[in-house]
Amino acid sequence: MSASPIADYHAFPDAQGHFGRYGGSFVAETLVGPLQELAQAYDQARQDPAFQLAYDRDLAHYVGRPSPIYHAQRLSDHVGGAQILLKREDLNHTGAHKINNTIGQALLAARMGKKRIIAETGAGQHGVASATVAARLGLECVVYMGATDIERQKINVYRMKLLGATVVPVTSGSATLKDALNEAMRDWVTNVQDTFYIIGTVAGPDPYPRMVRDFNAIVGREAREQMLAEYGRLPDAITACVGGGSNAIGLFHAFLNDRQVEIVGAEAAGDGINTGRHAASIAAGRPGVLHGNRTYVLCDDDGQIIETHSVSAGLDYPGVGPEHAFLADTGRARYLGITDEEALQAFHLLAHTEGILPALESSHALAQAIKLARERPRDQIVLCNLSGRGDKDVHTIAAREGLVL
C-alpha cells in the first residue's frame, strides 16, 4: 500500500462510484437497470429539501439524535495516557448506529413506491433497524441471516420477529454475513419491481457505498461539532471497528481533510492474523471483487473467498467497504487487528470502569482506543465510536466463559 497525497477526500467517489481503484459496480446485467434507477432516485432525493427535512426530523424525534460524546474518565485513568472519549451510538433507538442508515434508505424506498424491503444482517442490529423502520412505514420486511449468526444472536432474531419481519436462515457457505448478503442479492434480482434492498454496510455496487456512508456521516459531523463546542479542539486520534465499515466511515468522513487527526480502524483479528482464523480484510487481504465492488478481500491464491472468524458476528465478513481500501492505500487511515481476546478484555474493562456494556463489534474499537491512549500523553484525546450496545452479546460472552444463562 503506497501513500499518495489527496487534496480533498470529500471529492470521492467519482461519477462511476470509484474511490481510486476501488468501488465501482461489478454486477449481473439484470441489476444494471435497478442500480441506475436507485442511483438516480438517491441523487434526486439528496437535492430535495423535503426529503432532507423528513430524514433530519426522524433522526431527532425517532432515533434520538444527537448522540452525546462521553468522557470515559475512570477508563482513561485506569489505562493511563490520553483521555478516551466515546461517541455514544449505543444510545440510539434500536441500540446501534445502523438506524441512521435504515431510516434514510426506508424513506427512499417509500419515495420510490416500493412496498417490500429486504436486508442482510450479521450481528442482527441491521436486521432489527430494518425491521424497525419497515414497521414504522408500513412496509413488508424480509431479513436474510446466516444460520451461524442466528445461533449466536437469538435475542436480535426474536426482536426482528416481534417487529413483524420474516427472518430467513441462510445455510450456504459459512452461514454468516457474506452468505446472507448473497441470498439478499438473489432475492432483489428476482423481485426488483416492488422490492428495495437496504444494504447495511458501505459495500456492494455503486451507489450503496456512498449512500450508506452519507446516511451514517451524521455521526462524524456531530462528533466534530461537539468536539469543537465542548473541548475547543479536534481529537488527536479517532477509531472505530471495521467489518464492512459503515460505523467507521460514518465517524471518519467528517475528519478526512483534518490531516492533524490520526484515523485508525480496528479490524477483527480473531484468534490472531497469523492463525488464519480472522476477518482482517485490509491487514491480510488482497484486492479483488466481492458483492459488486472492487476492494480488499480475504481469498486464496485462486481468488476464492475464504472463511472468516470473529467472536463478533458483525465483523465476520471477508471484505471491506471500498472507501476504507482507498483510505488504507493513500495512507490517510491505518487498519490494525484486534483479537477476540483483546476485544473481550475491553468489553469487561468498560463495564467495570464506566457501567457501559459495549457491543462486541464496538469492543474491538475500544481495545484499539486503549492502545492509542497508552501511547499518548494525558493532554491528548482519543475519540472512539461506541457503535452499539452489548445486550445482544451477553449470551455469546457467557458461553465463551463457560457460563450457562
From Swiss-Prot:
Positions where N6-(pyridoxal phosphate)lysine occurs in the chain: 98
Under Gene3D superfamilies, the record lists: 3.40.50.1100
Q: Which cofactor does it need?
A: pyridoxal 5'-phosphate
Recorded hits in CDD domains, A to Z, give: Trp-synth_B (cd06446)
Could you tell me which InterPro entries the record lists for this protein? Trp_synth_b_CS, Trp_synth_beta, Trp_synth_beta/beta-like, TrpB-like_PALP, TrpB-like_PALP_sf
The entry lists its GO molecular-function terms as: tryptophan synthase activity
Assigned protein family: Belongs to the TrpB family.
Q: What is this protein called?
A: Tryptophan synthase beta chain
Give the species this sequence originates from: Stenotrophomonas maltophilia (strain K279a)
